[in-house]
Curated annotation (Swiss-Prot):
The modification Phosphoserine is found at residue 485. NCBIfam families: amt. It is found in: Membrane. Belongs to the ammonia transporter channel (TC 1.A.11.2) family. The chain crosses the membrane at residues 50-70, 85-105, 131-151, 156-176, 202-222, 246-266, 284-306, 314-334, 336-356, 369-389, 422-442. This is Putative ammonium transporter 1 member 5. It is a multi-pass membrane protein. InterPro entries: Ammonium/urea_transptr, Ammonium_transpt, Ammonium_transpt_CS, NH4_transpt_AmtB-like_dom. The keyword Disulfide bond does not apply. GO terms for molecular function: ammonium channel activity. It holds the Pfam family Ammonium_transp. Involved in ammonium transport. It comes from Arabidopsis thaliana (Mouse-ear cress). Keywords: Ammonia transport, Membrane, Phosphoprotein, Transmembrane, Transmembrane helix, Transport. The lineage of its organism: Eukaryota, Viridiplantae, Streptophyta, Embryophyta, Tracheophyta.
Length: 496
């Protein structure tokens, strides 16, 4: 702990006079005991802070569940809710058995961790159980992103397989590259950093959001669009989610959890900086919460007015997605940029999301939650944003002062950090495409990926989960007249 009390008998003997050695030893011993108690208290506070942050990030699973449920049609609600529970449960076991070791196992090489499988020889000198729990919450967030892209048409066994593979292997390898002190592109390396700086992805615009988004992109591409989304290869038909209320609820829960996702990624709070006695990591944590807030708010408002110009109406679900896109983008640089730069981040993130959605329609790509566009597209912009706007002072505070460490291009730091960020984008796209793309392709060839046309028309709840989620639910247009749909049609809800 910094600021520790130092004491020696030799220092006190001259002041206490003859026969003072024993007294000096006693006094120094007492001061040492007090110093140890302060150190223990600091560890306890840091671990409590990290545990609280882990609880917030885990609460995001409820946000994902509500967002997904509201974004699909009523006949598929039970299925999508079950997949969110599955992400957490299967992810917990596979991250415990393999994922944490691949990501942070000590010691390791630059590509993958090789120790601490099943948390053997744990805790270590640098990591406690609170750190494992926090990282598990991140891993299942990536899997939750993917489930939204392939909603309403995917076999349950495919969810089991992809979720376990993603949280147990694909995601941990990426997190090792950029977050482990041994990772080949990590800014935490003591030497031989990528382009002299390492790729800065503080809380996971690339590691979490791009990984989940690119995995979902391949799943949705290989499966193909839902029945009725692009009838006869023509214009897109909106297959609206059944509950804007659940979408808004999920969005606010995710917003709340993001205050553990981004500020919590400091992992410690009681670290003073050298800039002043009242300025330390606690200040950086507060600034990170502010930049997170401003980026999301700016993206929400930009989406509100941008979609109003394009569609002619105010759409709450579009605004919610814009808000989340702003959060996904700022996640990489939230700790190393000024608040004004976060506004720029959110503004551009909204435009990226709108543009990606337009491109998806042109390419006949169907993603019920816009997960690939939101998390993949906005996550990639977030990495580029760091290479442009990262501030030298904040980088040295967060990642440790290092002579010649590079910072944002627009802040006068040259282009090497931007180069490292572009490398991160390329390798994440390549790695996830090679692993998850191959997995989804194999599942399709084995007829384990997509449900039958009849089950898709009737709804996955009735076909595979014992019945509908609601006693009174809206029969979707494409289920009318299909045998086995016994629930009478209810009035359609008002347009959002």
């Amino acid at each position: 702990m910094s600021g520790a009390i130092t004491c020696s008998a030799a220092d006190l003997s001259a002041l206490l006079g003859p026969n003072a050695t024993a007294a000096a030893d006693y006094i120094c011993g007492q001061l040492g005991s007090v110093n140890n108690k302060f150190t223990d208290a600091a560890y306890a506070i840091d671990n409590t802070y990290l545990l609280f942050s882990a609880y917030l990030v885990f609460a995001m699973q409820l946000g994902f569940a509500m967002l997904c449920a509201g974004s699909v049609r009523a006949k598929n609600t039970m299925n999508i809710m079950l997949t969110n529970v599955l992400d957490a449960a299967a992810g917990g076991l596979f991250y415990y058995l393999f994922g944490y070791a691949f990501a942070f196992g000590e010691s390791s090489d630059g590509f993958i961790g090789r120790h601490n499988f099943g948390l053997q020889n744990f805790p270590t000198l640098t990591s406690d159980y609170s750190f494992f729990l926090y990282q598990w919450a991140f891993a299942i967030a990536a899997a939750g992103i993917t489930s939204g892209s392939i909603a309403e048409r995917t076999k349950f066994v495919a969810y089991l397989i992809y979720s376990s593979f993603l949280t147990g292997f694909v995601y941990p390898v990426v997190s090792h590259w950029f977050w482990s002190p041994d990772g080949w592109a990590s800014p935490f390396r003591s030497e031989d950093r990528l382009f002299g700086t390492g790729a800065i992805d503080f809380a996971g615009s690339g590691v979490v959001h791009m990984v989940g988004g690119i995995a979902g992109l391949w799943g949705a591409l290989i499966e193909g669009p839902r029945i009725g989304r692009f009838p006869d290869g023509g214009h897109a038909i909106a297959l609206r989610g059944h509950s804007a209320s659940l979408v808004v609820l999920g969005t606010f829960l995710l917003w709340f959890g993001w205050y553990g996702f981004n500020p919590g990624s400091f992992t410690k709070i009681l670290i003073p900086y050298n800039s002043g006695s009242n300025y330390g990591q606690w200040s950086g944590i507060g600034r990170t919460a502010v930049t997170t807030t401003l980026s999301g708010c700016t993206a929400a408002l930009t989406t509100l007015f941008g979609k109003r110009l394009l569609s002619g109406h105010w759409n709450v679900t579009d605004v919610c997605n814009g808000l989340l896109g702003g959060f996904a983008a700022i996640t990489a640089g939230c700790s190393v940029v000024d608040p004004w730069a976060a506004i720029v981040c959110g503004f551009v993130a909204s435009l990226v999301l709108i543009g990606c959605n337009k491109l998806a329609e042109l390419l006949k790509y169907d993603d019920p939650l816009e997960a690939a566009q939101l998390h993949g597209g906005c996550g990639a912009w977030g990495l580029i944003f760091v290479g442009l706007f990262a501030k030298e002072k904040y980088i040295n505070e967060v990642y440790g002062a290092s002579p010649g460490r590079h910072y944002g291009l627009f802040m006068g730091g040259g282009g090497k950090l931007l180069g490292a960020q572009l490398v991160q984008i390329i390798v994440i796209v390549g790695w996830v495409s090679a692993t998850m793309g191959t997995l989804f392709f194999i599942l399709k060839k084995l007829n384990l990926l997509r449900i039958s046309e009849q089950h898709e028309m009737r709804g996955m709840d009735l076909a595979g989960h014992g019945g509908f989620a609601y006693i009174y639910h809206d029969n979707d247009d494409d289920s009318i007249g299909v045998p086995g749909s016994p629930v009478p049609r209810a009035p359609n809800p008002p347009a959002v």
